A protein has these predicted regions:
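Outer-membrane beta-barrel "beta-signal"
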Residues: 205-207, 211, 231-243
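Cleavable N-terminal export/targeting peptides
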Residues: 1-35
């Protein structure tokens, strides 16, 4: 209980820091020290780490502000039939090839209060993520653990769901690339319904082609994902619009 109370204080502090940091980020942009960015993805199917979400094609916008090594951003997802909604806010800091990230996941249904932050009542999920990108080879490794919020096991205790993945990208040229990801979970977490200590949950292959339409670059990605734990697979297409 003492640990959970400390984590609760930590999360509330982080939330307040984010609110405090945002005006500074906006001021940095006005002074030329930051750069806004954004994109909108249209996907025929949304999958996250081998887990499907929604029942129809999905719109996924991103807006953010980059200030050197520091990033703050918002990411959202809504499907066309309104069976799935998600709004995330992230903070990240990059040092050379290592990126540390704190992500808050929230699913804004009408009954859920975005400001309900108590660990046993909130529908927020907070994850700490680390990603390392190798310098000489196009390989990355990522690890993430949920440290707070709506990630409870069958006993009602914090599960600390943990996921690792390794990925490889091969660029044929400036317009064509192929990537592959293998991901697995450790501990009895959300990826295996809080029942198994280990599970391979995400095997994904993607081919991306950069098209030019009216002098505008339009990346199109064809993906195939197989989740061995669920024994299910999906093929889907994503179009990306950046600004």
């Amino acid at each position: 209980m003492q640990i959970l109370r400390k984590v609760s204080v930590f999360w509330k502090s982080v939330f307040l820091l984010m609110m405090i940091a945002l005006p500074s980020a906006l001021a940095a942009q006005e002074s030329g020290k930051g750069e806004f960015y954004g994109s909108v993805d249209l996907s025929s199917k949304h999958l996250w780490r081998g887990i499907p979400a929604g029942e129809s094609p999905m719109v996924k916008p991103t807006v953010g502000l980059n200030m050197g090594n520091f990033d703050v951003y918002l990411w959202g997802a809504w499907d066309f039939e309104d069976t799935y909604r998600e709004v995330n806010i992230g903070l990240s800091y990059t040092v050379e090839n290592l990126t540390l990230e704190l992500m808050d996941y929230f699913y804004p249904w009408s009954k859920d209060d975005i400001f309900k932050l108590g660990n046993n009542a909130t529908t927020h999920q907070v994850e700490l993520i680390a990603t390392y990108e190798f310098e000489k080879i196009p390989v990355h490794i990522t690890g993430g653990t949920f440290i707070y919020g709506d990630d409870k096991n069958w006993k009602g205790k914090q599960a600390f769901s943990t996921y690792f993945e390794g990925g490889y990208t091969h660029e044929f040229d400036e317009r064509n690339s192929l990537s592959a990801v293998a991901g697995f979970s450790v501990g009895k977490g959300m990826y295996t319904d809080y029942t198994k200590n280990f599970g391979i949950v995400n095997l994904t292959a993607e081919y991306t082609r950069l098209f030019t339409v009216f002098n505008y670059d339009l990346p199109a990605t064809v993906s195939y994902t197989y989740n061995p734990y669920l024994e299910k697979s999906w093929a889907y297409v994503t179009l990306s619009f950046g600004f």
